[in-house]
Amino acid sequence: MENEKYYIAVNVGGRYPLLKTPQDYTEYFNEALSFRDLYAVLRYIEKHGLERIVIAVIKR
């Protein structure tokens, strides 16, 4: 599906509540990080050194 997007959630040491869905993520942060494909997600995670703190990659 072309309308599918991938979202990431990160563990920021308990500062934010666990976000269970992309909708919660969007509402809490006002603008979620979203990507068109899994490759873009993985490239972003690696580029910014987020390997240890990413807790979820969600496809919707």
Which stretches of residues belong to each language-model region?
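Short aromatic-glycine-(Arg/Gly/Cys) micro-motifs in beta-strand/loop hairpins
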Residues: 2-30
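Short, mixed-charge low-complexity intrinsically disordered segments
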Residues: 38-60
